[in-house]
């Protein structure tokens, strides 16, 4: 509740001027209508795992990636895009889910070499290393970023103006 109250000014995309970014926040991040697999996928998970999993499901459904690199939540991601393949060794990765454990800094450097303007990276538990999240948002490889408190979403389309949105999720 305290997290929600501290971010109340960032509800439902208020203050976002870009129609594309607003649409992503409103209809992917904060979508409340049930999707076709909501009742089945992750029904036995705890509330936060399920909340994040359903977000990852919606992102995969929206992006329709060909290749996914993931540190977890494969069932949610696969339900979001049935045709996606999980392959950490692919030359190009469309969707990345990264947990901040192990040598995540060097992994991100490698990921930067495998993404394109259409790719999306989800970094889970960004509060674990706030300085790392700031580095990601300021990095020359990244474009639009979304801070959802529990995770961060990174877009790589650098043709657009760089922004970091704080979203009440």
Each predicted region: which residue ranges?
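Structural detector of well-ordered beta-strand residues that form the stable sheet scaffold
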Residues: 120-122
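A short alpha-helical cap/connector motif
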Residues: 1-117, 126-169
